[in-house]
């Protein structure tokens, strides 16, 4: 089933590229498609992410911005990425040297977006990410209702099974559903669209039983709240910017109603949710298979970390530690990354990985008041349990988080910016230049 989804995904992307390049507004269309590709997992051509290929094609299109002021971010990012990738040549336990090339390709793709993305490009990319996340969630709901054939995971965890959507496993579905929840809440949408997008992603975020996504969402909300308090305490009182609140109350009401109906119709679901939430607090129980596996893997990674030289064991070395903590020293292991991105990168690169780790965390915190910054924070927290740092989504969010703070210096003020957004139009996810706060 996974191969079928990947095949359909690859064919759809290729056909979409052909259609986009013949579209009158092909730059906006390809920007949207770039956001869609960032929401896919494992769609590659000769081990090159479709996201990277589309970024190169997108660079060749006319138009866009010239964001010269972003170079101060790209220089440290490029240095950190090259330093970490160099461990593929130095490490003694490198499992797949091509992972270094994939990383450099993703960083290069992010650099392209940073240097050339305009406000409208960024908006289109976020829309593409929202659409593909919601499609994945919709497929997950159809799997739960048996309308799409699939093998539901972990019936011992959930009485109705854990859907996978268009992704290889439920944890990834949960992460992308969380991305969809944040985007549908923050972006300006018509009331009906906000309800549909929010409800679809929220329901799947719950039904996927992905604890990493739950923790990440709560952690992101707490950091956003802390940032808001700090900002108000350190800045003069001014006109308060109101976000796109249209439809939020309706979305909350729909989520409450749908939850009540689901819990009433399937009483076992309530017990499953309570038990799943309880496993996030306190000691991991013996029957918590995924929790026990994560503990064993982290223990093995810690043991491996005790022996790292200054440049680590080499990028992808952490992948030699299996899901249950077994260490595969000979041959090529199936995985190339660890579940915990920070611990895995330390095993891979040790001090050579620290600059990249520090850059990602710092960028997420500095941009926590923007939409891309909040999404990046969510993905990084989730990646402490299910590593998505080597996925395109992390790097498009890195690029958009950088440009979220630089946008006002990059492109001329357009007539739309000076006159306001026309009635019925969807506002940009970034504030106009006169704004005193990030969205």
How should each PLM-predicted stretch be described?
Residues 152, 163, 282-352:
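Long extracytoplasmic/lumenal interhelical loops at the membrane interface
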């Amino acid at each position: 089933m996974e191969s079928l989804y990947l095949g359909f995904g690859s064919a759809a992307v290729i056909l979409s590229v052909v259609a986009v390049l013949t579209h009158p507004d092909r730059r906006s269309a390809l920007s949207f498609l770039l956001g869609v590709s960032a929401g896919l997992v494992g769609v590659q051509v000769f081990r090159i992410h479709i996201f990277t290929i589309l970024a190169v094609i997108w660079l060749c299109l006319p138009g866009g911005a010239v964001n010269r002021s972003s170079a101060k971010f790209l220089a440290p990012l490029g240095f950190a990425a090259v330093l970490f990738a160099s461990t593929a040549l130095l490490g003694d336990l490198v499992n797949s040297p091509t992972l270094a090339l994939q990383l450099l390709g993703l960083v290069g793709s992010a650099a392209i977006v940073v240097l050339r993305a305009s406000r409208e490009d960024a908006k289109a990319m976020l829309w593409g990410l929202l659409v593909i996340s919601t499609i994945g969630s919709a497929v997950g709901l159809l799997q739960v209702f048996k309308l799409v054939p699939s093998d539901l995971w972990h019936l011992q965890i959930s009485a109705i099974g854990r859907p996978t959507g268009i992704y290889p496993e439920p944890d990834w579905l949960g992460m992308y559903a969380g991305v969809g929840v944040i985007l549908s809440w923050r972006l300006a949408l018509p009331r009906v669209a906000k309800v549909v997008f929010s409800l679809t992603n929220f329901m799947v975020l719950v039904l996927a039983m992905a604890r990493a996504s739950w923790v990440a969402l709560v952690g992101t909300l707490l950091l956003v709240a802390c940032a808001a308090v700090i900002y108000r305490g350190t800045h003069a009182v001014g006109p308060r910017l109101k976000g796109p609140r249209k439809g939020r109350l309706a979305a909350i009401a729909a989520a409450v109603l749908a939850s009540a109906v689901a819990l009433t119709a399937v009483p076992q679901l309530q017990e499953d949710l309570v038990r799943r939430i309880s496993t996030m607090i306190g000691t991991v129980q013996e029957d918590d298979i995924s929790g026990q596996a994560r503990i064993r893997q982290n223990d093995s990674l810690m043991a491996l970390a005790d022996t790292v030289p200054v440049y680590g064991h080499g990028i992808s070395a952490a992948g030699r530690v299996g899901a249950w903590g077994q260490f595969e020293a000979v041959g090529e292991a199936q995985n190339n990354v660890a579940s915990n991105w920070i611990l895995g990168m330390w095993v891979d690169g040790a001090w050579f990985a620290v600059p990249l780790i520090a850059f990602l965390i710092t960028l997420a915190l500095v941009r926590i008041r923007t939409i891309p910054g909040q999404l990046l924070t969510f993905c990084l927290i989730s990646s402490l349990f299910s590593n998505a740092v080597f996925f395109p989504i992390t790097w498009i969010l890195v690029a958009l988080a950088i440009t979220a703070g630089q946008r006002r210096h990059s492109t001329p003020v357009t007539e739309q910016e000076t006159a306001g957004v026309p009635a019925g139009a969807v506002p940009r996810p970034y504030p106009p230049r006169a704004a005193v706060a990030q969205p």
